[in-house]
Amino acid sequence: MKLLHIDSSILGDNSASRQLSREVVEAWKAADPSVEVVYRDLAADAIAHFSAATLVAAGTPEDVRDAAQAFEAKLSAETLEEFLAADAVVIGAPMYNFTVPTQLKAWIDRVAVAGKTFRYTEAGPQGLCGNKKVVLVSTAGGLHAGQPTGAGHEDFLKVFLGFIGITDLEIVRAHGLAYGPEQRSQAIDAAQAQIASELFAAA
């Protein structure tokens, strides 16, 4: 099984989402040693944001693309193929200013591709990635789950994943991290307990 592990936090070793996403992957490997992990750090190796140049590159025949267009097309193709090849995805998704990191949004824009991850039909849009499992590691300084302030974070990610057909979704949540050392410790402990006792108990 191929597992795509994505981190998007800019905080490096101080990141709770990185710590927890790593622990999810480690637990997954312990439950299934055959797992092949591909790691993408969207902060250290940021993907260029979706732009007019991206669309122009996609619409230009390969043999007449200039260097910039070739780079854009290659980036889009490699990012998409990496996602399509994965059987499962672990996404570290901290909340920044009520939404996901811009680096994660740039990745989403490269994998939300009509005809590849979804398609339009007479009955409406149809997701094409229903065979994938996703574990979303959601972290935030405040308490936003189920609140209007969380609409651009977890809710947005659930809408996107559902749109491309993913229904096998687990959320590991550590919120309230900025409410003090005790609250932070409790939130991380609860997330770690979920990883250890729930995610892979039957794996």
UniProtKB/Swiss-Prot annotation:
Pfam assignment, any one: Flavodoxin_2
State the free-text cofactor note.
Binds 1 FMN per subunit.
MF terms in GO: electron transfer activity; FMN binding; oxidoreductase activity, acting on NAD(P)H as acceptor; oxidoreductase activity, acting on NAD(P)H, quinone or similar compound as acceptor
Question: Which residues are recorded as binding FMN?
Answer: 9, 15-17, 95-98, 139-142
User: Catalytic activity, per the record?
Assistant: 2 a quinone + NADH + H(+) = 2 a 1,4-benzosemiquinone + NAD(+); N,N-dimethyl-1,4-phenylenediamine + anthranilate + 2 NAD(+) = 2-(4-dimethylaminophenyl)diazenylbenzoate + 2 NADH + 2 H(+)
| CC cofactor | FMN
Q: Which UniProt keywords apply?
A: Flavoprotein, FMN, NAD, Oxidoreductase
Q: Where on the tree of life does the source sit, at the highest rank?
A: Bacteria
Annotated EC: 1.6.5.-, 1.7.1.17
Looking up InterPro entries in the UniProt record yields:
Flavodoxin_fold, Flavoprotein-like_sf, FMN-dep_NADH:Q_OxRdtase_AzoR1, NADH:quinone_OxRdtase_FMN_depd
Family stated for the protein in its record: Belongs to the azoreductase type 1 family.
Query: What does the UniProt record say this protein does?
Result: Quinone reductase that provides resistance to thiol-specific stress caused by electrophilic quinones.
Subunit-level organization = Homodimer.
Name of this chain's protein? FMN-dependent NADH:quinone oxidoreductase 1
Record gene name: azoR1
